[in-house]
Amino acid sequence: MIVIHSVAQMQQYARERRGDIALVPTMGYLHEGHASLMVEARKRAKYVVASIFVNPTQFGINEDLDSYPRDLEHDKEIAAKAGVDVIFAPTAADMYPDRYQSYLNVEEITVHLCGASRPGHFRGVTTVVAKLFNIVAPKVAFFGKKDFQQLAVIRRMVRDFNFDIEIVGMPIVREKDGLAMSSRNTKLSPAEREKALCLSRSIAAAKAAFRGGERSVAALQKVAAAVIEAENSPLIDYLEFRDQDSLLPLDKADERTLLALAVRVGSVRLIDNSILGED
C-alpha cells in the first residue's frame, strides 16, 4: 500500500489504471464501518483507493473541523488490513488552491434533515466528492448508509451530472450495544457514550410500534422521541419519517419508510437511521 498526497500524482496513478479503480471516500479516523466498505471494494475492482480528507467546505461556523479526530498512522493500519492499494490524503491547499471559486450544489433533497441545521454542508460534500471522482476516476464508489441523506445526494449528483460511476451503499456497522459506528464516537465521555444509545433504542422502539400495527407517522415520532427525551440531556436536532427515495415527509408509514434522526449528546452531534421494514 502506498500513500499519495499530491493531486497530480493521484491523477497520474489513476490514468495508468483507468477503468478498474474502486474509491472509498472518507474523512479518516477509520473504524470497522469504513473497513467494511474497503473489503467490499476489494471484491469489485483491481485497485482500491481510500481517500482521507477532512473537507473544510462541509463544516459550518462553530462546527468541529478543528477538533475532528485525525490519525493517519492508525488509518494506514486499518486500510492495509482491508486490502487498500492507495491512501489518497491530499492537503486542503491542494484541493482548494488560492482563489478557488467553483462549487457544486444539489437542490431540494439537501435543504431538509441535516441540510436544515447545517447550511452549506451538502454543497461542500458534493463539491469534494465530485473533485475526488475527477481525480481518482473510479468505476465504482462506496458510501455507508449511516449518512443516508449524503448517499441520496451523491446518487442524485451522479445521475444529474452523468458521472459514469456505480454508487454502492453499504449497511450501517454497529457496536455490540447498537451504537452506529462513527469517528465522532471517540469524542464522547463514558457517560455521554451511554446516553448515545438512545439513538438506536429510539429506532428499535419505533420499529416495534410499526410491527405492532402503528402506521401514523405522528404517533411513531412520539414513540421514538420519548426514548430520547427520557435521557434528559440529549437534544433532538431532527427525528423524521421520510420516503427513502425522495426524502419527502410522510403522514403514513410503510415498510420502505426511512426513520432518520440527529441527536446532540453533549457537544457531539450523532446521526442514525433505519428502514422500518428491515431488521
Swiss-Prot record:
Broad enzyme group: ligase
GO CC aspect terms: cytosol
Pfam (any one): Pantoate_ligase
Highest taxon listed in the record's lineage: Bacteria
Gene Ontology MF term list: ATP binding; pantoate-beta-alanine ligase activity
Chemical reaction(s) catalysed: (R)-pantoate + beta-alanine + ATP = (R)-pantothenate + AMP + diphosphate + H(+)
Active site: H34 (proton donor)
EC number: 6.3.2.1
Keyword ATP-binding: yes
Record-listed (R)-pantoate binding positions: Q58, Q150
Subcellular location: Cytoplasm
Binding-site residues, beta-alanine: Q58
Record's keyword annotation contains Kinase: no
Residue positions binding ATP: 27-34, 144-147, 173, 181-184
One Gene Ontology biological process: pantothenate biosynthetic process
Keyword annotations: ATP-binding, Cytoplasm, Ligase, Nucleotide-binding, Pantothenate biosynthesis
Pathway per the UniProt entry: Cofactor biosynthesis; (R)-pantothenate biosynthesis; (R)-pantothenate from (R)-pantoate and beta-alanine: step 1/1
Disulfide bridge partners, by residue number: none
Family: Belongs to the pantothenate synthetase family.
Function per UniProt: Catalyzes the condensation of pantoate with beta-alanine in an ATP-dependent reaction via a pantoyl-adenylate intermediate.
Oligomeric and partner information: Homodimer.
Family annotation (HAMAP family): PanC
Note: The reaction proceeds by a bi uni uni bi ping pong mechanism.
Protein name in UniProt: Pantothenate synthetase
Lineage: Bacteria, Pseudomonadati, Thermodesulfobacteriota, Desulfuromonadia, Geobacterales
Designated gene of the protein: panC
